[in-house]
Amino acid sequence: MVDSDGFRPNVGIIVANDDGRVLWARRAGEDAWQFPQGGVEANETPLEALYRELREEVGLGPADVAVLGATRRWLRYRLPRRMIRRRGSRCIGQKQIWFLLRLLADEQRVRVDRVARPEFDRWRWVDYWYPVEEVIFFKRQVYRQALQELSGYLQADDWAGTGTEGGPAAVIPPAARRRLR
């Protein structure tokens, strides 16, 4: 699904541990590392896509994490020209709602091999700002924007708690709860 401007709706997923370090995953068969992310399907909310992609890409379910926050609006990046497909619907980039999650489960629950064709083949914990300089160049600005906007949730007083005080709706902006058509 591509919107009228040529951007594919997508969710970006930042999973943080108790030390505030974030899950960084290597794309299968490549020397490219990134946060988990994935497309939002028709008639699905970004929040629903978050949980589906979380299960598919790193093997975690809703009980394994707490949603700490989400970006207030869609963040966009453009693909380099050489990566734009010439056939089918013309996708020029991605628009993403980013979620910051706290890992509640033991880190051994993180599994990148739970699907037939895994997106990732390795993962590790890195410092919060590390991904900004290490992700592929065309995603850097969006990573910087998402990490900046969500960084306050790591410094919140409830970090030692579950992060779910008030329930998910308390930290999920309307854009992340709207069903895509």
Curated annotation (Swiss-Prot):
InterPro entries: Nudix_hydrolase, NUDIX_hydrolase-like_dom_sf, NUDIX_hydrolase_CS, NUDIX_hydrolase_dom, RppH. It comes from the Bacteria. Keywords: Hydrolase. Its cofactor is a divalent metal cation. Accelerates the degradation of transcripts by removing pyrophosphate from the 5'-end of triphosphorylated RNA, leading to a more labile monophosphorylated state that can stimulate subsequent ribonuclease cleavage. The keyword Transcription regulation does not apply. Transmembrane segments: none annotated. A motif (Nudix box) lies at residues 38-59. This is RNA pyrophosphohydrolase. Pfam families: NUDIX. GO terms for molecular function: pyrophosphatase activity. Residues 6-148 form the Nudix hydrolase domain. It comes from Halorhodospira halophila (strain DSM 244 / SL1). Belongs to the Nudix hydrolase family. RppH subfamily. Its EC number is 3.6.1.-.
